[in-house]
Amino acid sequence: MVLKKIKAGISVKIMLLFKHTVELKKHLKQNSNKVVGFVSTMGALHAGHISLISSAKKECDIVVSSIFVNPTQFNDINDLINYPRTFEKDFAMLEDAGCDILFAPEVQEMYSEEELLLKKQNIEDRSWTLGKEIHFGSLEKVMEGAFRPGHFNGVAQVVSKLFNAVQPDKAFLGEKDFQQLAIIRSMTKQMAFAIEIIGCPIVREKNGLAMSS
């Protein structure tokens, strides 16, 4: 059954919200015959993120998005503290875009205390995802990675956890963050996830500046 509500005189589908992996997996298992698309975000959404939702809707039966401000990819604790959190606005944007499911876990749902401690002790190109050690070599040490040591390890770690929770058929990422896209492709291959990684075209501001997604 598809739940709908009336918004501005128009009937729109209600987006489901899950905060726990077990409940999300249980729901998705009931729709195992459907093609699931996934768009991961840290919130503070804009048109670039919504374009990924639109791309996913064109190719998938169910579109899942996530909002999770990932602590393991920040080099500076102040950046983590000051990262914009606009959940209500983000929720409305995703629902209006036709996203079917939002996964918005707390930190405790995604990481154990031991994992957070291990991240603090992380050395150069070593990354632990779902108990498996993976390596990105020089891929994470150039461009943005040269100035943010450990950043892409944190990205790969959280995306692997999100992939494990959602178990999508396809994941949609913006080509603007090209290095991150390459890292996710590498992680997906090393972890043997049966997920198609789809890079989506860059969305730009009116002045030509690329939107980050």
Language-model segments: residues:
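Nucleotidyltransferase catalytic core that binds NTPs
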Residues: 12-213
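N-terminal amphipathic/basic-hydrophobic helices that include classical n-h-c signal peptides
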Residues: 1-14
